[in-house]
């Protein structure tokens, strides 16, 4: 959807966009399957908003109460805020495009959604990459001088890196929209012999456009893969060393290391799937209403939800806070009945 350009005339642009969004000829899906996809997407959005909201609330409360927060907590606050905003935006976009297509097809509304979508996705990718980078620097066991110096300075660098990521994501999202706008405005119409039909050059140099749209995905993706892989290898090596010296099979330290390896592996898989789905979605390899395009949307919605549930399960503090919240919610109706 983001990669498609439209002719310069506003009314014709809106008409073409509305036709493209709801053209039944492009739809391969039955009404039942469309309803099912919408239900799955809405469930994923709600789960993601609740899970990320919980993580943000816990660390924000710690930040306010103690006037300070851990570096990992700071990253998680930034990451949770970006994901809540992204999930809310996607849910709002589906609602508006389904109920008021004419309003959604207006230039200001349409491009506002697209700029926000790109910006929040890139922010989420960058923040998750910095979280992986921070864990790698703090946990991995390497003795290189540069690595040890980075470990000493990483706490002070993270706040600057987070705000730099926001600036890079915003600049890139604006750049992507400007590229598409300039490209569309320079796609001159070709008149037919009777001057009643116009053919617009709307998909020239698709590879170049896809490159510009997806440039912001590659760097955080590579950084996340490298740091997560190196951290897994470091933990695996340390676990094997502990196993050779362990006296019992139920060593709590070894179980903690194995749990960390599994959690990071899940993070890595989710991150890669999300980045690939986002790449395909922005590149418009498939029709808007096709099953593959909807599958990309489901994966992109599942990533913030799944990636947020795992820290709640693996982090002892978050797990305890979640159990306390469940207990309060369970007791709350009983207090009203007394």
Curated annotation (Swiss-Prot):
Keyword Transmembrane helix: yes
Record bears the keyword Transmembrane: yes
Keywords of this entry: G-protein coupled receptor, Glycoprotein, Membrane, Receptor, Sensory transduction, Taste, Transducer, Transmembrane, Transmembrane helix
The name this protein goes by in its record: Taste receptor type 2 member 39
Phylogenetic placement of the source organism: Eukaryota, Metazoa, Chordata, Craniata, Vertebrata
Protein's membrane topology: Multi-pass membrane protein
Cytoplasmic side: 52-74, 138-156, 227-262, 313-338
InterPro entries: TAS2R (IPR007960)
Protein family: Belongs to the G-protein coupled receptor T2R family.
Gene3D superfamilies for the chain: Rhodopsin 7-helix transmembrane proteins
Membrane-traversing stretches: 31-51, 75-95, 117-137, 157-177, 206-226, 263-283, 292-312
Residues in the Extracellular compartment per record: 1-30, 96-116, 178-205, 284-291
Additional remarks: Most taste cells may be activated by a limited number of bitter compounds; individual taste cells can discriminate among bitter stimuli.
Compartments it resides in: Membrane
GO BP: detection of chemical stimulus involved in sensory perception of bitter taste
GO molecular function, one term: G protein-coupled receptor activity
Organism: Pan troglodytes (Chimpanzee)
């Amino acid at each position: 959807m983001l990669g498609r350009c439209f002719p310069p005339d506003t009314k014709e642009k809106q008409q073409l966009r509305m036709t493209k969004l709801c053209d039944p000829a492009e739809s391969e899906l039955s009404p039942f399957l469309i309803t099912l996809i919408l239900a799955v997407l809405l469930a994923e959005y709600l789960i993601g908003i609740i899970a990320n909201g919980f993580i943000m609330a816990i660390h924000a409360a710690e930040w306010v109460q103690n006037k300070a927060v851990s570096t990992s907590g700071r990253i998680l606050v930034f990451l949770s805020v970006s994901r809540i905003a992204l999930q809310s935006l996607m849910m709002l976009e589906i609602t508006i495009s389904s109920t008021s297509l004419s309003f959604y097809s207006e230039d200001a509304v349409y491009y506002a959604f697209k700029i926000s979508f790109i910006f929040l996705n890139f922010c989420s990718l960058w923040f998750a990459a910095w979280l992986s980078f921070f864990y790698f620097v703090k946990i991995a066991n390497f003795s290189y001088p540069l690595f040890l110096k980075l470990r000493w300075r990483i706490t002070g660098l993270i706040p600057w890196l987070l705000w730099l990521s926001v600036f890079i994501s915003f600049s890139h999202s604006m750049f992507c929209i400007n590229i598409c706008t300039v490209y569309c405005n320079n796609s001159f119409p070709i008149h037919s012999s009777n001057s009643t039909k116009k053919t617009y050059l709307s998909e020239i140099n698709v590879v170049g456009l896809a490159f510009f749209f997806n440039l912001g995905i590659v760097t955080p993706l590579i950084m996340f893969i490298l740091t997560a892989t190196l951290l897994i290898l470091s933990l695996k090596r340390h676990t094997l060393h502990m196993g050779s010296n362990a006296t019992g099979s139920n060593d709590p330290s070894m179980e903690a290391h194995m749990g960390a390896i599994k959690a990071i592996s899940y993070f890595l898989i989710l991150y890669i799937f999300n980045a690939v789905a986002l790449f395909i979605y922005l590149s418009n390899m498939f029709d808007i209403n096709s099953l593959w395009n909807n599958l990309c949307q489901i994966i992109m919605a599942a990533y913030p939800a799944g990636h947020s549930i795992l820290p709640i399960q693996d982090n002892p503090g978050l797990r305890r806070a979640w159990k306390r919240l469940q207990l309060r919610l369970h007791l709350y109706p009983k207090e009203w009945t007394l």
